[in-house]
């Protein structure tokens, strides 16, 4: 009976199968990439032994004081000093081409002895011989650096060539969001380089007992140990590594859950329509002795079989999808070893089983609800027609008969269109959400979520002992450059802030004129007076500070009270920054960063190239390029998701339209036959069906667009809230969002309506009379 029923209703059964299969594919794929990401990142971190805490420092320091501190604190399990030789990008070449266009800061390092190892592509500790170099995987992918290529370091009359012998994975600095990259060379080579160019920077790296990071930060600051740089926790490193892949996992899982919900709605609709159509048959079965329980099992079996087959195929397809989307994860982090394959195959099975349980329980509830009628009611074939309502025909006749009848029937039978309406909302939402996310990330104004106002160029001055002199030289040039509309110079340094526990933490501060490139603040405004400070969203949250409250800073052994003037969004430096008018001592500065706006007619790329030739000690980056390099991986991922969601959404719209039309035509065959008997042609009836579906679709697209533009912003903000941006304003491409996407959705549905509605030709009044 089940097999015959599936054969009889091939299209409807196939559509339900497709819904369940697609949701199983996405659920399985999302779980698989999630497992792959977590296990690969954890495996890389374990083999590399990333530090629990890192304190960066430039300049001389007291080695004995550091050693004594380590000896006197039992929670420190291991300690080492990693020396990094910072090299200007203009002094670094790949196959003759300078790195000066790269946003990344580059440092040469030798392999560490105790922990924080740089690994090769087999996730083994990389060994580099003299004259060779290990290049980060980031440069392999972004700049096309390959094994055997030449990397040249050149300054003045000094030059040295290295052969790329290894592509390395750096558990600390793999992510594009980490703006520094380490290049691995031999110990002898780094000593030679240091005597000719570059500047040393030190990383004080700690392995700690669990839960000791807060104690270390407090004790380290209290001991007044070297801290001319940022402090980074291992958890922040892990968060940066998981950010880009975490977004795609969240999106895939969300789509999968929504698809299961839509499949459940379709299932409900199909079961109710089937039971209504076979009401008299069910009545006969009950009359001859079948119990409700037996009938329920019989009808439930069909949908369980469909769900099982869809789940198996979806599981296999989802694993292929997961492996495809996991390629970049494996490339950057490697494959985890051990029993990971069992976990990667096992956890998606649990997801598919959950889907099967949802379908089974849903079938039981829906069928039970529809078997409440008495045997007499079922034998009579009584249905819910009386609940559909009615509409009046116009007294003076039809002006547009097809439109009048279509909207009249839509008014009476709106309940049967709820499922397709929800699917159209979902499809529109699904198309627009990733598209709007990608547009927002790629737009120059996304800079505001990185803690600075929108600008054309970013200029960095760092890695030099005469930082102030370089800044003055840059300022003199900018003042005399007729192409520049405005610029602002910002100091970046660190101070200490009093936290809620009465202890001192490090805080990174930007000091400069905030009015030149203003931000949109979540709350309050930019600091104007010398006693005002603005906090990033995560800093305000962690310090539990609101607008108007006091905050105590300690700089150069002086405690100063500030008033919180504003709270802004920032996803850089782990989302923990601040802005204040604090004059840093030159030796305490990390960098000067200058933001520049050019006059409208000036070509940004051309001007950037010109400034690089003049300002040889500075790093000049167009803001679009800055965003592309920092968030390029995320943007590429969103591009893949955007294409996939368009295809899935159109497929869903076509499937659900086909299914609903088939069910409506079967249910309304009497009405169709009567209309044809009184003079309506097949084309008239097809037009009436098309008007109903397209009216529902246009309304659904409108609602979906509103939700994507509003609720979608909240979703994106929720994704980024852990990184420092809680409230995102979508930057929408109106042509794509409001013309192209709705147009292609309407066209796809129009085509399927045209094809499926041809079935009205088989309904005739003579057949209804015979029946």
Question: Residues of each region from the PLM?
Answer:
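Juxtamembrane segments of multi-pass membrane proteins
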Residues: 55, 401-530, 534-538, 549, ...
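Short helix-loop junctions at transmembrane helix boundaries
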Residues: 312-350, 698-767
């Amino acid at each position: 009976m089940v097999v015959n029923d599936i054969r009889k209703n091939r299209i409807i059964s196939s559509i339900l199968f497709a819904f369940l299969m697609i949701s199983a594919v996405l659920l399985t794929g999302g779980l698989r990439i999630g497992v792959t990401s977590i296990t690969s990142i954890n495996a890389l971190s374990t083999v590399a032994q990333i530090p629990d805490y890192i304190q960066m420092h430039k300049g001389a320091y007291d080695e004995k004081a550091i050693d004594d501190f380590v000896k006197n604190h039992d929670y420190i399990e291991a300690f080492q000093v990693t020396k990094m030789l910072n090299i200007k990008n203009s002094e670094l070449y790949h196959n003759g081409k300078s790195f000066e266009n790269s946003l990344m800061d580059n440092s040469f390092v030798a392999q560490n002895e105790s922990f924080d190892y740089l690994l090769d592509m087999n996730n083994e500790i990389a060994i580099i011989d003299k004259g060779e170099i290990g290049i980060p995987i980031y440069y392999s992918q972004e700049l096309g650096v390959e094994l055997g290529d030449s990397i040249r370091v050149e300054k003045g009359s000094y030059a040295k060539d290295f052969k790329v012998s290894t592509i390395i994975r750096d558990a600390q600095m793999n992510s594009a969001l980490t703006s520094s990259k380490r290049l691995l060379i031999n110990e002898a080579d780094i000593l030679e380089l240091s005597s000719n160019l570059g500047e040393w920077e030190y990383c004080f790296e700690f392995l700690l007992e669990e839960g000791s990071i807060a104690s270390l930060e407090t004790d380290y600051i209290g001991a007044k140990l070297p801290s001319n740089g940022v402090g980074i926790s291992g958890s922040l490193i892990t968060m940066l590594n998981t950010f880009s892949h975490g977004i795609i996992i969240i999106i895939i899982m969300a789509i999968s859950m929504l698809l299961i919900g839509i499949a459940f709605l379709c299932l409900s609709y199909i079961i109710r329509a089937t039971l209504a159509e076979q009401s008299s048959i069910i009545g006969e079965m009950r009359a001859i002795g079948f119990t409700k329980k037996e009938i329920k099992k019989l009808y439930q079996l069909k949908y369980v079989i469909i769900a099982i087959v869809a789940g198996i195929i979806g599981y296999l397809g989802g694993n292929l999808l997961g492996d495809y989307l996991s390629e970049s994860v494996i490339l950057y982090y490697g494959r985890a070893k051990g029993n990971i394959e069992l976990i990667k195959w096992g956890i998606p099975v649990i997801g598919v089983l959950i889907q099967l349980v949802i379908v089974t329980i849903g079938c039981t509830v829906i069928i039970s609800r529809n078997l409440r009628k008495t045997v007499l009611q079922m034998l009579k074939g009584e249905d819910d027609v009386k609940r559909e309502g009615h509409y009046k025909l116009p007294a003076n006749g039809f002006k547009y008969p097809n439109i009048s009848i279509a909207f009249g029937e839509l008014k009476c039978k709106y309940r049967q269109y709820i499922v397709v309406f929800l699917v159209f909302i979902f499809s529109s939402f699904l198309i627009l959400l990733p598209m709007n996310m990608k547009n927002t990330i790629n737009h120059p104004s996304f800079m505001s979520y990185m803690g600075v106002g929108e600008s054309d160029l970013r200029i960095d001055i760092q890695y030099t002992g005469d930082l102030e002199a370089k800044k003055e030289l840059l300022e003199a040039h900018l003042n005399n450059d007729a192409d520049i509309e405005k610029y602002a110079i910002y100091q970046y340094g660190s101070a200490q802030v009093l936290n809620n526990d009465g202890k001192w933490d490090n805080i990174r501060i930007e000091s400069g004129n905030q009015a030149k490139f203003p931000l949109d603040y979540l709350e309050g405004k930019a600091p104007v007076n010398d006693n005002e400070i603005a906090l990033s969203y995560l800093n305000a949250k962690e310090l539990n500070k609101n607008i108007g409250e006091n905050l105590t800073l300690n700089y150069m052994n002086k405690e100063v009270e500030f008033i919180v003037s504003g709270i802004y969004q920032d996803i850089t430096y782990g989302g923990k920054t601040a802005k204040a008018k604090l004059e840093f001592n030159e030796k305490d500065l990390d960098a000067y960063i200058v933001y520049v706006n050019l006059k409208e007619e000036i070509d940004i790329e051309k001007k950037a190239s010109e400034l690089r030739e003049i300002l040889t000690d500075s790093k000049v980056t167009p803001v679009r390029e800055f965003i592309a390099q920092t968030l390029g991986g995320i943007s590429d991922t969103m591009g893949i998701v955007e294409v996939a969601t368009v295809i899935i959404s159109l497929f869903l719209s076509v499937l659900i339209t086909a299914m609903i039309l088939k069910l409506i035509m079967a249910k309304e065959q009497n009405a169709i036959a009567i209309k044809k008997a009184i003079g309506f042609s097949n084309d008239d009836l097809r037009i009436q069906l098309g008007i109903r579906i397209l009216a529902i679709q246009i309304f659904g697209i409108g609602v979906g667009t509103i939700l994507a533009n509003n609720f979608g912003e909240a979703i994106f903000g929720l994704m980024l809230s852990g990184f420092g941006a809680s409230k995102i304003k979508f930057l929408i491409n109106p042509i794509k969002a409001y013309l192209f996407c709705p147009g292609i959705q309407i066209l796809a549905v129009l085509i399927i309506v045209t094809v499926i509605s041809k079935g009205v030709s088989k309904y005739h009044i003579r057949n209804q009379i015979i029946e």
